[in-house]
């Protein structure tokens, strides 16, 4: 997994559309980059579409033609039936398309967090929900030594873009150009593999008005009101 060609091959052999439609079934959105699309008007690069043929070439270049001599590798996930189903599906995809063997390990939440924090894993399932609406909230996770960077990955060029260049820009348009350049590095190096973007389902009574959906799923309660005109 120290070889980025292997990491990219793994990313290219996850069929995200099949995963979201047939396994998750909750309206989740296939993710082809680290940042959700249209986060404050930012659109990330889209370079991770399902491509088993390219993945096989990358594995061969890395010294593992048709999966030969590739060591059995582990996927760690916290105990949850949904996470188990996703892990099993990815395990099967990698076996079918790359002919590699994957071992699944589940741990209770606190044990799992310790394993991830200590780097005691090979591949680990993880998730992130943004605290505020800005692509920086997803991209600054992967700076060298960052508290949320549990990958062991460190890239000085990436850090410079996120920590030095982007903050200098006064407009979102110029900041987003820097973020796009940084995310290109992230996708090329592939320390993490984006799979899908969370969605939320809400039951809303027809009398509730002025509920404006937003990416954080946070209602502005001062703007809500009830109407007697039921639809």
PLM region descriptions:
Residues 90-104:
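Short alpha-helix C-terminal cap/hinge motif
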Residues 70-79, 103-105:
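Short, well-ordered beta-strand elements
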Residues 4, 52-74:
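Immediate post-signal peptide segment of exported/extracytoplasmic ligand-binding proteins
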Residues 44-52:
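DNA breakage-rejoining catalytic core of tyrosine-based enzymes
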Residues 1-6, 48, 66, 167-170:
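Short helix-loop capping/hinge motifs at secondary-structure junctions, enriched
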Residues 3, 52, 83-87:
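Generic alpha-helical secondary structure
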Residues 9-43, 81-91, 113-231:
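Detector for C-terminal structural segments
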């Amino acid at each position: 997994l120290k070889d980025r060609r292997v990491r990219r091959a793994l990313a290219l052999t996850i069929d995200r559309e099949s995963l979201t439609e047939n396994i998750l079934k909750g309206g989740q959105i296939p993710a082809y980059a680290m940042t959700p699309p249209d986060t404050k008007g930012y659109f990330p690069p889209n370079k991770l579409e399902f491509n088993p043929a390219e993945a096989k070439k990358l594995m061969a270049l890395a010294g593992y033609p048709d999966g030969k001599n590739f060591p059995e590798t582990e996927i760690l996930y916290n105990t949850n039936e949904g996470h188990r189903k996703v892990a099993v599906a990815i395990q099967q995809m990698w076996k079918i398309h790359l002919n590699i063997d994957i071992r699944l390990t589940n741990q209770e939440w606190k044990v799992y967090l310790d394993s991830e924090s200590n780097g005691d894993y090979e591949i680990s399932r993880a998730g992130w929900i943004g605290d505020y609406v800005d692509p920086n909230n997803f991209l600054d996770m992967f700076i060298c030594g960052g508290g949320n960077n549990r990958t062991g990955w460190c890239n000085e060029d990436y850090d410079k873009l996120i920590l030095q260049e982007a903050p200098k820009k006064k407009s979102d348009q110029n900041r987003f150009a820097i973020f796009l350049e940084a995310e290109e590095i992230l996708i090329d190096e592939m320390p993490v593999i984006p799979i899908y973007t969370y969605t939320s389902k809400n039951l809303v009574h027809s009398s509730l008005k002025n509920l404006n959906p937003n990416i954080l799923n946070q209602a502005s309660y001062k703007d809500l009101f009830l109407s007697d005109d039921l639809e």
